[in-house]
Amino acid sequence: KGTEEEPYIIKSLEDMNSLSESVADGNSYKGVYFKLSSDIDLSDNKEFSSIGYWDGLKSNDNGEWWESEKNRAFEGVFDGNGFSVKNAILYAENNYFGLFSYIGKNGVVKNLNIDSTNRLTAHNNVRKIAALAGINLGTIENCTNSADFGFTASNVTYLAGIVGENYGIVTGCVNNSNMISAGNSKSGIVGENYGTVRKSENNGYLSNSGNVGGITIENRNGKGQALLFIDDYADLSVNGEISECVNNGAISGKYDVGGIVAENYSCGKIENCANPQVFACYFDNFCFRLPEENSHNVTSPKMYQNCHDNA
């Protein structure tokens, strides 16, 4: 059991809680397969405690870096099989929160829907939170988020539909959630991207004073990131790339607003993307359109390739 041919079957709230508790106990499930056999109703859980935990990186005066001993990665393969998680209250008390808070380098979450009966809420002053994952170093594939983001916590930053911070691959994902109340920076798919985002789509209405992007808030080249100083992650590609993505959602804000990306730093790459939706700027009108302009002086025209913007 637990193989690709005979995965562990998850069919109930109890199974989800068991997986969450086991990962919290330090079991990463590297190479182990899980598969949903039906929709999972989490309504009997007042607040689902998430799968995995990210406490960040630690260092010493010698420049050595390591993962916090509190980190708990999910390294297995979780196949939603086209089914949905329903009626969950996902309460982000800490940074880097989602249904899966930490998807490790070998982890895969795919074919999973977080439907509109789920509610994401948050403590004040948290960052990098999303319906599906807090931080991803692995692969998120063919997942859809439609959760309710109608909470009122203050100073919530890097709020996203799919993943708060991405170093891995996000492909074939869709956000349908509107984000118009809480949150100081918002995106449909990824909050901060150092990895690859492709063939993904935002359909949600995103509104904020600033830092609003249909696909990602920030697209970055992560050269020099502390994560790369840890042997297990030295081979990570941390050049932010966004390709074949579409924003269909209305976007509005005062500054750093983009149909695809709000801010493109340090030679992040964007290609074959489209923003057919009109987005609105107000007050200072400091907004960015593809492909001519971006907010952080990417000088090479090759950073934007074959993009279309009707805003």
Enumerate the predicted regions with their spans.
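Surface-exposed repetitive/solenoidal architectures
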Residues: K1-A311
